[in-house]
Amino acid sequence: RAEVAHIEFISYGTSRIFDRRMRSLDWKRKVVTFLGVFVPLMIGCAVLSFGLEAPFLPLCITIAGVASIMQLGFSLWSLVSGWDRSYSDCMASVKENTAIYNLAGSVRKKIGKLDEAKLEILIDDLTEKFERREQEDLTLCVSDKELRYANRMSCFYFKKKCHICNVVPLTLKPGKCVCDGCGKF
């Protein structure tokens, strides 16, 4: 049935959007954490190893000062942008969209094997989960660029033609593709 294939296609692409966001946020969060630990550790280790009279200690303090400014800037950016909340939202979306995608694949395999009433119950459950997750994902401000990315990922994975350019993507990268459905991201 077409609606099951559609849910599978969309859920896969949506999980790719939020996985991509999650990886970007993960790197940023690691930088903030690294700088927060590195600065005091660098000064502490230098003083413990070489004492307060070490000739290079002023250079270490200067480097630590610059690193502290960077760390404070990243920390402030993280707080204002809500990186931790966004990371959690992305992780929840990836997990749930992947579960919906897997469920859709399972339901699709049962088409023709189950009687129509049981199949309808499975499809209704799948549709309800998909629509609820879709509403939650809409609050996460998905851009047109991300939608094109998701469409390309799904078209490539499912070996389907893009709905605009009617081409099956051969790679995950858009390259010179100028299609408004699967390129320009």
Regions flagged by a language model, labelled:
Residues 38-42, 66-73:
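Hydrophobic alpha-helical cores of multi-pass transmembrane domains in eukaryotic membrane proteins
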Residues 39-56:
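Juxtamembrane "helix exit" motif at the C-terminal ends of alpha-helical transmembrane segments
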Residues 174-185:
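Cysteine-rich micro-motifs
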Residues 55-68:
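Hydrophobic alpha-helical transmembrane segments
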Residues 1-38, 73-172:
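Conserved non-transmembrane functional hotspots
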